[in-house]
Design a protein with these regions (language model features):
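Loop/turn positions that initiate beta-strands
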Residues: 50-52
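Short, conserved beta-turn/loop elements at beta-strand boundaries and strand-helix junctions
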Residues: 23, 36, 82-87
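Short coil-to-beta-strand transition motifs
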Residues: 13, 25-26, 66-76
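C-terminal output/interaction extensions
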Residues: 85-115
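N-terminal helix initiation/capping motif
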Residues: 1-34, 44-46, 108-115
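Short, charged beta-turn/beta-strand-edge "cap" motif at the junction between a beta-strand
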Residues: 58-63
């Protein structure tokens, strides 16, 4: 069974700032894609697979006056896999430990609607 078959939600393309770390988010990265149960992250710092981590996901929300507001959604997760590339950023696959209601609402607002 592939990783894609194990996912409860399909991933959406999502490139925004993230911060992550073992005890607190101290390393910078960029998301590649996102779902309520996980994400891929590109960073100069890759953490060890099977590590428990904390991730701050920076999301842009549109306020009533049509201006952008930056909010942080904090999730706990586990590094499932990591790929290290010479002279290039590393990539990590993260599985979130628990469904986060705020993240689910954000995800549902971003998924393309069928006509």
């Amino acid at each position: 069974m592939s990783i894609k078959q194990k996912r409860s939600y399909r991933r959406i393309y999502f490139t925004e700032k993230v911060k992550f770390g073992y005890d607190k988010p101290i390393y910078n990265g960029m998301s590649v894609d996102l779902s309520p149960d996980g994400m891929n992250v590109i960073s100069d710092k890759a953490l060890v697979p099977l590590s428990n981590i904390i991730i701050d996901i920076y999301v842009k929300k549109i306020k009533a006056d049509h201006t952008e507001k930056l909010e942080i959604i904090r999730v706990e997760g586990e590094v499932i896999w990591g790929k290290h590339f010479p002279d290039a950023p590393s990539k990590m696959g993260i599985r979130f430990n628990n469904a986060n209601e705020e993240l689910i609402r954000f995800y549902k607002a971003k998924i393309p609607r069928s006509k």
